[in-house]
């Protein structure tokens, strides 16, 4: 595990410095893909921050080389900060000559959570550009989004407090240990598409062991295992249908006559109807072809029979004339009979070839008959419907409620999924401890008042019931979509906003769907599901289409005696007693494993996230009312009376491409931190246009050297103000006309100091003084 000082990583860091990443096209392409960026072109977001790329193609090529090299450098050793000098050392001349551009790229990627995030050792200094009162941030929620936002904001020089209403870190990522010491994950337990997820970097930083899931899965239909050939057959059918839907979803919006979005269930039914219709047409054409070939075969056979009889009759008559000695008496008849025999035999050969062709065709048609139905309505249809049930498990709702245009499933299905031996909650807990975040548990936010000037006021209920008011310059809300839905209907169990949320945001919250995935977690005295070549993940197909997404997927971590299954959508909201749910689960297991399955588990736990007052559901999805702008409207920050954006929103429900995923939650927190920094301390790029901004006074005092695992040292408010050149309240603020001269002197001194140093050190930027 990681230490507070990061000394454990020294050997690996030295090796990374000596060897460096393998910078070739394949490595650069892999690095860009792992960061979810295109390898061969800049994104629109990058073009907005680097407008000089519009000028000529060469600038784009250089930018892509440096950007991808930066990503590769960070991914090679994410235990240590990736600096501009590290990147320059890994790029060949002359592309490493523009250190300012490299610095800007490193700054951009760091700011937006693509490099230098999580738990790593810093080698540069952190700059604080705001006075203490103006750099305070309160993050509501200590889930993946909250931890991500807090760690990023602290790296950017903000003072962060995280408020968590629960008694532990993780939010909807929750786990506990049973009496026998087994980890039971009651919340999010799977990391999806991990190969291009920031979670892979976090796993590497804390040295956690992960296990792939759903790579090869056993399938049981009515208690009998399905052979792998049939499994792949159904998978191919599903992938074809899924691919067709995804293709159509990206062509245009799909709405019905009333203007409502078409559901994925309706789209699948339409597709299956088309397949059934196509199958019937093929069956009709097959029958028609079979009948035509059979008639042709019969016709050729009759022709052969007739020609044979003709030749036989002529031959018999010719023999008779020969026996009677009349061959010379009637030469015309003799020649006529011989001609009939020759003609019949010649024609017979032609007809025989045609008959053989028709007969072979007829046999092939009978050997490979055309199916009358695309899918058997019994077990085959139920098995295929399990694939749709797997989609419901990923979304958390029945496909009847999910928009056809929803394309977030591809970011959950494709790629490698993994579970952790220690549990995902432990990953976030260790990361928070190593970063020494100020997380205050059992602090429930009751009201978010953004009506003030230059601050946001929170009303917080502490563990003992006392109400406390907390003030911050900025707030990052990671309240789940289920809680926000309760807020807009004035449910007393949900926090309130003062003033009320804007109508556009309220409508967006109302339109985004909130799924529900509950778990039935069973602990046994032994692992029976891996016996006889079994696997840690398996499927039991339900014959009932209504329950196709519930209690069908079973998952466990290798070596663990805990087995869990999932209950999805409306089935998850049924208020069945725990013992009934456990009994239903055991019935499914006993059908699949027979006598190998124990009669009952030694312990069990049922989750009910839809009733959890701090969640009210499992995650967001695109409902039939969700518009393309809904997610942007939800994450639109709220402005205080001074016109400044101060309340920002994060959470998986603000990440449209990765809803209902831990990865989406983490990415949304990094995005919110970047938005706050960009809005209030500026982009912070080096001016490479030729007219550089002047650097401020007392630059060295502004730079604070810290380890990322350590707490940023506190500074006196007056001292912090004095550190900022020409600040309004600074005691020795310089006049504007004196600034260029002072800046010039500082630059000369800085250049002299650099010349004396054996190793070049990059200086973090100070905002330009206007």
UniProtKB/Swiss-Prot annotation:
Entries under SUPFAM superfamilies matching the protein: FAD-linked reductases, C-terminal domain, FAD/NAD(P)-binding domain, Homeodomain-like
Keywords of the record: Chromatin regulator, FAD, Flavoprotein, Nucleus, Oxidoreductase, Repressor, Transcription, Transcription regulation
Necessary cofactors: FAD
Chief location bin: nucleus
Coiled-coil spans in chain: none
EC number: 1.14.99.66
Disulfide bridge partners, by residue number: none
GO cellular component, one term: nucleus
Functional note: Histone demethylase that specifically demethylates 'Lys-4' of histone H3, a specific tag for epigenetic transcriptional activation, thereby acting as a corepressor. Acts by oxidizing the substrate by FAD to generate the corresponding imine that is subsequently hydrolyzed. Demethylates both mono- and di-methylated 'Lys-4' of histone H3. May be involved in H3 demethylation in mitotic cells including gut and embryonic cells. Participates in the transcriptional repression of the presenilin protein hop-1. May act via the formation of a multiprotein complex that remodel or modify the chromatin.
Complex and partners: Probably part of a large repressor complex. Interacts with CoREST protein spr-1. Interacts with chromobox protein homolog hpl-1.
Listed name of the protein: Lysine-specific histone demethylase 1
Species this protein is from: Caenorhabditis elegans
